[in-house]
Swiss-Prot record:
Subcellular location(s) per record: Cytoplasm
The protein's name in its UniProt record: Peptide chain release factor 2
Gene name, Swiss-Prot/TrEMBL: prfB
Highest rank taxon of the organism: Bacteria
Pfam families with a match to the protein in the record: PCRF, RF-1
Length: 365
């Protein structure tokens, strides 16, 4: 005979956890809002304002993610209870194992929804930008920065996020000096915000004929794309706008026209660049979006001493502000804030970052 009590206890536990989430995620309000959003999207003139329609579509996906999962959990737990009773009555082991398997699947869905509680920041649901900047160390640091770029692109792909390479500056010999990518998807900023900081690489350098160990640094800075409704006052007189020929990936169009744009905000010293479109006008618009987002993030940091300290540290791409150490010779990657380690270095460099990210979010970093 199979053990019934542990399964009943688990059903009870999952039911209770689902009820807690209903309250925490304000389920009833989300159901109501989903009905409103659906009604708005059904209006024949909704696409007269494309940006508003896109925002509503994005909101609907986020709301459905919560509402549909809660409904699935409610119905699923009821179904499992029915299967369990059927298994007991018929003394049917196959039905019992079916109930156990369904319960495990429901627990995984619930755990994913519970993890969303980590995304409680004001802009966690937003798309975001990731700036990468090579530290001192010449070619070795520039190669490391390109490895980080690949790592984040692979990670985003594994999460189903959309990525755009906004700007990349090639290294002198190999690698890149800097890059900016835009990551779009549900809770993109929430997932990536704890990646801001210095990433340290230790390895035997392929660029050293004596095969000596080298230490290199690269900085990552993650900031959210902000809503157009948020008013950021930018004085055109404070801007220096340069246009130049794009370099790097871009096919036959590269280096033929001055479509790439660089904007310097003189009072703050912030520099943003974009070269991913053939149109100079579109690149300029994208630069202004990035500048607006960075200025907004700077304002938030001024109100928060810890975040301000983090931004101050960013300027020193060296030992003091590291978040993660990648020691390839020892096959060890360690997060210096949470203590999480992974010895499968290639998997991490191929984008397997969830263990590190989840630990830092759970630690409230």
């Amino acid at each position: 005979m199979f053990e019934i009590n542990p399964i009943r206890n688990k059903i009870s536990d999952l039911t209770e956890r689902t009820q807690v989430l209903r309250g925490y995620l304000d389920f009833d309000a989300k159901v109501e809002r989903l009905e409103e959003v659906n009604a708005e999207l059904e209006q024949p003139d909704v696409w007269n304002e494309p940006e508003k329609a896109q925002a509503l579509g994005k909101e609907r996906v986020a709301l459905e993610g919560v509402v549909n999962t809660i409904h699935t959990l409610d119905q699923g737990l009821e179904d499992v209870e029915g299967l369990l009773e059927l298994a007991i009555e018929a003394e049917d082991e196959a039905t019992f194992h079916e109930a156990v398997a369904e319960l495990e699947e429901l627990e995984q869905q619930l755990a994913k929804l519970e993890f969303r509680r980590m995304f409680s920041g004001q802009h966690d649901a937003a798309d975001c930008y990731v700036d990468l900047q090579a530290g001192s160390g010449g070619t070795e640091a520039q190669d490391w920065t390109e490895m980080l770029l690949r790592m984040y692109l692979r990670w985003a792909e594994s999460k189903g996020f959309k990525t755009e390479l906004m700007e990349v500056s090639d290294g002198d010999v190999a690698g890149i000096k800097s890059a900016t990518i835009k990551v779009s998807g549900e809770y993109a900023f929430g997932w990536l915000r704890t990646e801001t900081g210095i990433h340290r690489l230790v390895r035997k350098s392929p660029f050293d004929s004596n095969n000596r160990r080298h230490t290199s640094f690269s900085a990552a800075f993650v900031y959210p794309e902000i809503d157009d409704d948020i008013d950021i006052d930018i004085n055109p007189a404070d801007l220096r706008i340069d246009v130049y020929r794009a370099s790097g990936a871009g096919g036959q169009h590269v280096n033929k026209t001055e479509s790439a744009v660089r904007i310097t905000h003189i009072p703050s010293g912030i520099v943003v660049q974009c070269q991913n479109d053939r149109s100079q006008h579109k690149n300029k618009d994208q630069c202004m979006k990035q500048l607006k987002a960075k200025l907004y993030e700077m304002e938030l940091q001024k109100k928060n001493a810890d975040k301000q300290a983090m931004e101050d540290n960013k300027s020193d791409i060296g030992w003091g502000s590291q978040i993660r150490s990648y020691v390839l010779d020892d096959s060890r990657i360690k997060d210096l804030r949470t203590g999480v380690e992974n010895r499968n270095t290639q998997a991490v460099l191929d984008g397997d970052l969830d263990r590190f990210i989840e630990a830092s979010l759970k630690a409230g970093l």
